[in-house]
A protein has these predicted regions:
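Conserved acidic catalytic centers in enzymes
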Residues: 50, 138, 215
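Acidic (Asp/Glu) and glycine-rich low-complexity loops/linkers
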Residues: 2-10, 17-117, 121-135, 146-153, ...
Length: 241
């Protein structure tokens, strides 16, 4: 459990630094008023800070635009750092901010990693490929309609929630705090799940699973899962019939 806690906090710290700093190149906005467009391409990872609402769609071409009150869009910072698209606030703006009605629309060929720091919401229509990684630090939400990959890694530190449907071969899920992986509609071949705290994990696992639970959380991997369980605390684990 100590190893998992260190890994989770490390991921959260790295994400916070990348979103909150001046690293990467700021992408200038075109347009004015309640709509802005940003000419940026060549990224496959997205990092979001604060309370913004981000809508991500898979498509053949790259596109980034934002809608909302003009004064809030003036504070928005879109940056490009290698493979990363970073959505945050200008350095002169204290804290991450609430977003106050800002919505960012992103289209890209494939999303390989999603990072949320704060209370933002990211909604993704579909993710395909070999691997996918998601990191949530705070109370943010990540909603994925269809996740189809060989492997997926989910790290949640705080009260955030990841919801997903689809089919993957292997899942690694680490939850620390009161967060949740709510993926009863996600079909998984095999899984490695760790929960420390009052968090919850739900998925439909058809093969072997390793579960480590410490605290009052709950893990439900469905009736077909064949689990090796290590449990300490008042939490519950459901595996198999």
């Amino acid at each position: 459990m100590h190893r998992i806690a260190i890994a989770l906090m490390g991921a959260a710290s790295l994400t916070a630094c990348s979103v909150g700093s001046d690293e990467g190149s700021t992408v200038p906005a075109s347009g004015s008023g309640p709509t802005r467009a940003y000419a940026v391409e060549g990224f496959d990872r997205i990092a979001v800070a604060g309370g913004d609402d981000v809508d991500v769609r898979a498509g053949t071409a790259f596109s980034v635009r934002a809608e909302g009150p003009a004064d809030e869009l003036d504070k928005l910072r879109i940056a490009h750092d290698g493979r990363d698209l970073v959505i945050g606030r200008q350095k002169r703006v204290l804290g991450f901010g609430s977003g106050k009605g800002v919505k960012v629309f992103v289209t890209l060929p494939r999303l390989s990693e999603a990072n949320i720091v704060g209370s933002g919401t990211m909604t993704v229509d579909r993710i395909e490929g070999t691997t996918f990684e998601a990191n949530i630090a705070g109370s943010g939400d990540l909603n994925i309609a269809a996740l189809t990959t060989d492997a997926a890694e989910v790290n949640i530190a705080g009260a955030g929630t990841l919801r997903a449907g689809g089919t993957i071969k292997r899942l690694e899920a680490n939850v620390m705090g009161s967060g949740s992986l709510d993926a009863a509609g996600l079909r998984v071949g095999e899984a490695d799940v760790t929960v420390a705290g009052s968090g919850n994990v739900r998925a439909a696992v058809s093969g072997r699973a390793k579960v480590e639970l410490m605290g009052s959380g709950n893990v439900d991997l469905g009736a077909a899962a064949q689990c090796d369980v290590s449990k300490k605390g008042s939490g519950s684990v459901r595996c198999g019939r």
